From Swiss-Prot:
The gene is HBB. InterPro entries: Globin, Globin-like_sf, Globin/Proto, Hemoglobin_b, Hemoglobin_oxygen_transport. It comes from Francolinus pondicerianus. Involved in oxygen transport from the lung to the various peripheral tissues. Belongs to the globin family. This is Hemoglobin subunit beta. Heterotetramer of two alpha chains and two beta chains. GO terms for cellular component: blood microparticle; haptoglobin-hemoglobin complex; hemoglobin complex. Gene3D superfamilies: Globins. The lineage of its organism: Eukaryota, Metazoa, Chordata, Craniata, Vertebrata. It comes from the Eukaryota. Heme b binds at H63, H92. Signal peptide: none annotated. Residues 2-146 form the Globin domain.
Length: 146
């Protein structure tokens, strides 16, 4: 994947403003609420019976932070995303059996969360760079699938 200097700047500039815990928790909660079939991968998280329960669930918050923290690894390694997510791809494919389509869904939700939090900074050019990034990350995570 080729990144222009402008794309890199737009991605890293916005990322520097992201509250990983807050945005990560919101993104994962939205995934579980908007696409309820994804909840089956999180059965061990306890009560996911309603949007209120999901939004208040400490395990959802913690895992959302973990997910977005690893997304930060993509931002730090824009030129090597495939290798950066190699082990996570294996884990989600071989052990967790997560449908790779869910990575795309989470990426789309992350775009919505970023737009909501940073509306002034989230210009069309910024959105285009982030759409490219979430697409590349989703592809890297789906790489180990057969």
């Amino acid at each position: 994947v080729h990144w222009t200097a402008e794309e890199k700047q737009l991605i890293t500039g916005l990322w520097g403003k992201v509250n990983v815990a807050e945005c990560g928790a919101e993104a994962l909660a939205r995934l579980l609420i908007v696409y309820p079939w994804t909840q089956r991968f999180f059965a061990s998280f306890g009560n996911l019976s309603s949007p209120t329960a999901i939004l208040g669930n400490p395990m959802v918050r913690a895992h959302g932070k973990k997910v977005l923290t690893s997304f930060g690894d993509a931002v730090k390694n824009l030129d090597n995303i495939k290798n950066t997510f190699s082990q996570l791809s294996e884990l989600h494919c071989d052990k967790l059996h997560v449908d790779p389509e869910n990575f795309r869904l989470l990426g789309d939700i992350l775009i919505i969360v970023l737009a909501a939090h940073f509306s002034k900074d989230f210009t069309p050019d910024c959105q285009a760079a982030w759409q490219k990034l979430v697409r590349v990350v989703a592809h890297a995570l789906a790489r180990k699938y057969h």
